[in-house]
């Protein structure tokens, strides 16, 4: 019974996305052909991933991330490239934001939101690629639903870890 309910729900989501994609389409010669669709996908992904961020506030801090955090907040902690320097410095920007509020959790949450936005932009580009190459709207809707509803992407989007940004 639950499998039937899941099937009906997935069908309804894909049908709804297909209708929305039809309404967002613009004339063939328009420069903004994909713009509204991509904005919709971006907002949809962030909304779909928000419950994960709220559940794991300030984000899902992985064990490896503590080394990068220590490199940024401890004076005299030796820097090394076991965790990429670019990632550590990027994370450091958000830790400094947290310092402004005297709460590193705020900085980590800002990092999680920024990483989620970057990953959503990458996925938007993938959806745009499908659209530009003439993929049928059902495939586009299935792709959007997959990225929005598959928990792995939401979990990865809020993970304070070096891998999500490099794999995006």
Name what the model sees in each region.
Residues 1-51:
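Start-transfer (signal-anchor) and selected internal transmembrane alpha helices
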Residues 13-17, 21, 90, 94, ...:
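Alpha-helical membrane-inserting segments
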Residues 35-40, 126-149, 167:
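Transmembrane-helix signature of polytopic, membrane-embedded enzymes
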């Amino acid at each position: 019974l639950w499998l039937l309910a899941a099937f009906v729900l997935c069908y309804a989501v894909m049908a709804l996305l297909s209708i929305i994609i039809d309404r967002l389409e613009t004339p063939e010669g328009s420069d903004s052909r994909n713009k509204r669709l991509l904005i919709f996908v971006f907002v949809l992904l962030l909304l779909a991933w928000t419950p994960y961020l709220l559940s794991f506030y300030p984000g899902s801090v992985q064990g490896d991330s503590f080394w990068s955090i220590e490199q940024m907040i401890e004076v005299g902690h030796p820097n090394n490239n076991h965790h990429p320097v670019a990632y550590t410095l990027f994370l450091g920007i958000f830790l400094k934001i947290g310092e402004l509020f005297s709460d590193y959790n705020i900085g980590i949450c800002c990092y999680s939101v920024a990483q989620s936005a970057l990953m959503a932009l990458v996925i938007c580009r993938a959806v745009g690629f499908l659209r530009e190459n003439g993929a049928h709207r059902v495939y586009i809707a299935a792709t959007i639903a997959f990225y929005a509803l598959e928990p792995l992407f939401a979990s990865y989007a809020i993970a304070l870890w070096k891998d999500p940004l490099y794999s995006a």
